[in-house]
């Protein structure tokens, strides 16, 4: 008798689990057999300490398939209301050119790449970022710019810290913030200043700056209520006391307004959102950061520079990396690791697509419509607070404020209440004549009858930007902004750049501690839904019921995965999550009256962001040693605890450790810290080895940040966006970050503000929601198990060729492993960099180099890679070891072999003469699979020293592009 298939199986609700996890059943069996294991359960029992095991993810709903998850989320999205928003405050409706939407934002060749630490296979993104820097340099009038920041408010806070670093002659500890800055910027400045130990004074900068002795000051240009004013008097007042003047500028206004740099500003920050990036209820967006060249070594963030490769060809790279957290740790200029690469390149492609004339036309249209609206409002008898404006009008309405606001709401329009007597209206790229008519109708209480078009002549004649503030000449002058105005040319340019880079759509990216797993297409689809993209972050919350549901459900999911009691979604990067967690700890101890606690214990193996974050909250970093097995040295930890006792605020520890092992004594470590009343911060960078097996909130953690762009499938975007929410135990929950504009449930404004938007980069939270919903408890656990299986399989295959530096007590690793290359360097002169570059010839991105131990490679394959891909990588690594053995034996010279000459380009392969002691095929196609498909690095090894000594961070002449 035959049996039918159950409906549960036919609906295939677990379908996605098998699509996300790489190895199939046969491959899994083969991998286990190779390691002499009976089952994955046996591997997990031998790897993960029993003392921390649990199954908290059982609280998750059962998995659903892709279609079901998309339908559920579409239903949630439908509860958001898409009003026309004229709120402004740094967020504006914009139009994403379809060629950029489809070929960048929706393209895995762009969104699945990693930060360009290996520049030879990242020349496309690097060119896009260099163009971005050029755009910011020209618009701001600064000498240099970095390759993006997280948002405008945190960029302003970073600028404040930078001002303190460089104003060495100035002994003041006071920073002045203009009250006309956006309120979210002021809130982030207040939070940062309080933990840096700065005094922050907020006032009217034109009247009060010269009453203070300050090391720096910031103003908004135009002001948050719309006024445009000459910056020169403010600049002069700041410079008279050796203080720096920071300007937070609106990027579209800079097309028509005189640049802050031309007026003497020292640092210029702002948001690129209105250059073709959806509002997304707060993000993600790229911020910009322009500065004077003399401050280049004090600036935060990535900087892209021009160098040369070994053939003398122009090549791009990340410059001056010694400023950054992964090298300088607590002495770094900033704790920022991820920036906003995907959004930065989208914004510059927007500028390149429109060109200087196009963006000028957009800015002039917005400005002209604003003048027409002003003419109509004044004709109705309304009074404007300012006569000088770009796109924002401040209308004095006195006791009519609430009535007009409500009338606008009834018409599907969002205005901004300013103080108690005014409403502001910020126009945007999407504003039409019909919108002007609607706004005039709202303000006339339905009595408006004037023909809107008739306002045009008078508006065109009106000069409302002061002569001293008008830009002379085009805003964008480099030829790169005049090359790609047709869709055909832009499409091909984007493809040319994409083809220069290795992303996950090419091959595994085995970067340790980075978790480059599958970013499934179904997870990405909702990101571009207008129901999520078109909401202003400060719109009334009743318009964002869908987002509220999304936040609540995702918080519950993350609580189930971590064992924590509360989740804050505000931090928009892992670095900001670390900062938010440490701020919560600080606030907690202030509440207890234990302000003497200022010691942060950090193991030597920690991520560089950990000490950099600790110093941002005025904690003193004390390093705890690691033992020969890679574990935290318990004896040294006990000694440090005895020495510092009740002055200890926190221990920051990554688990599993960055050495790639599950430390057996983690609960004892947590207990020891708790014994002196301190808090345990468990860095969530390696959560991909824990979800479904062990929860940090259950085995001793008080707070963790979660890299949603690692464990929970938000793509890395070539270096951003990311999201770094934090989970906390109940005693820390009252101290989570609030927001001054949009109240966050169960938080207080006085707790401080971490990011510009209340829920960070809200629109990409849909990705993690989709991932967890489609995986369910069963799938989340399986993902973790296969991450551990894949890593151990690689370690097993490579251990006879490279020493595995650290293993757990039973001889297994966690989800990543360290290959010790120091003996090889001693015997052959071959370095970890040589192997990293040689891997490019095999079509692979290198593992993480020299972290957490110098002279090593850290490999993390993730659960998404099949056995075939793991074998391909292992075959490449084994072949490289064989090549190195020829150097060891003297068959190949130390200074002329496939490793030290790597990577090999098409130019190398086509050289008319070949004088190297190995063949062209050995150079470029060292394994058979490369005969069928080959990814060519577009430049040879780049000269890092030359690039830093001859620092060029703007676009070369157009001739240098055509010469190539």
UniProtKB/Swiss-Prot annotation:
Keywords: Oxidoreductase, Pyridoxal phosphate
Biological processes annotated in GO: glycine decarboxylation via glycine cleavage system
Enzyme class at the top of the EC tree: oxidoreductase
One Gene Ontology term, aspect cellular component: glycine cleavage complex
CDD domains (UniProt xref): GDC-P (cd00613)
Pfam family, one: GcvP2_C
Modified residues (N6-(pyridoxal phosphate)lysine): 710
Cofactor(s) named in the record: pyridoxal 5'-phosphate
Reaction(s) catalysed (UniProt annotation): N(6)-[(R)-lipoyl]-L-lysyl-[glycine-cleavage complex H protein] + glycine + H(+) = N(6)-[(R)-S(8)-aminomethyldihydrolipoyl]-L-lysyl-[glycine-cleavage complex H protein] + CO2
Molecular functions (GO terms): glycine binding; glycine dehydrogenase (decarboxylating) activity; pyridoxal phosphate binding
InterPro entries linked: GcvP, GDC-P_C, GDC-P_N, GDC_P, PyrdxlP-dep_Trfase, PyrdxlP-dep_Trfase_major, PyrdxlP-dep_Trfase_small
Catalytic activity, EC: 1.4.4.2
Protein family (similarity comment): Belongs to the GcvP family.
Function: The glycine cleavage system catalyzes the degradation of glycine. The P protein binds the alpha-amino group of glycine through its pyridoxal phosphate cofactor; CO(2) is released and the remaining methylamine moiety is then transferred to the lipoamide cofactor of the H protein.
SUBUNIT field: The glycine cleavage system is composed of four proteins: P, T, L and H.
NCBIfam families, per the entry: gcvP (TIGR00461), PRK04366.1 (NF003346)
Protein name: Glycine dehydrogenase (decarboxylating)
